[in-house]
Amino acid sequence: MSDKTLTRMDLSEAVFREVGLSRNESAQLVESVLQHVSDALASGETVKISSFGTFTVRDKSARIGRNPKTGDEVPISPRRVLTFRPSHLMKERVAAGGKN
């Protein structure tokens, strides 16, 4: 397993090399795509990217939790959480170590 992290800059550089846009245009394209995804998720929409996976926003209701150290009950407030479900193709690719 690698400890490398893929960044916006890495994505922009990949678009620059593979698509042929200028570095500035590549960075703008990546920013635009990420902004659209962020906006959709912030408004509660589901984002489905074919052969990659699905991002969804779920509302979790209030509940009573427990402090693991003390055993005291603690109220947990309602919140929205972001979830990602990878596609079957992505699961297979990760399981194969990215060799597909």
Swiss-Prot record:
Name the GO terms of the biological process aspect: DNA recombination; positive regulation of metabolic process; regulation of DNA-templated transcription; regulation of translation
Q: Which UniProt keywords apply?
A: DNA recombination, DNA-binding, Transcription, Transcription regulation, Translation regulation
Check the record and name the InterPro entries matching this protein: Hist_DNA-bd, Histone-like_DNA-bd_CS, IHF-like_DNA-bd_dom_sf, IHF_alpha
**One GO MF term, please?**
DNA binding
- Does the record carry Disulfide bond as a key word? no
Give any Gene Ontology cellular component. Answer: cytosol
Determine if Transcription regulation is one of this entry's keywords: yes
Q: Which CDD domains match?
A: IHF_A
* Transmembrane segments annotated in the record for this chain: none
Question: Briefly, what is this protein's role?
Answer: This protein is one of the two subunits of integration host factor, a specific DNA-binding protein that functions in genetic recombination as well as in transcriptional and translational control.
Q: Give the matching NCBIfam families.
A: himA, PRK00285.1
What binding partners and quaternary form does the record give?
A: Heterodimer of an alpha and a beta chain.
The Swiss-Prot or TrEMBL record describes its family as follows:
Belongs to the bacterial histone-like protein family.
Name of the protein: Integration host factor subunit alpha
Native source species: Cereibacter sphaeroides (strain ATCC 17023 / DSM 158 / JCM 6121 / CCUG 31486 / LMG 2827 / NBRC 12203 / NCIMB 8253 / ATH 2.4.1.)
Q: Which gene encodes it?
A: ihfA
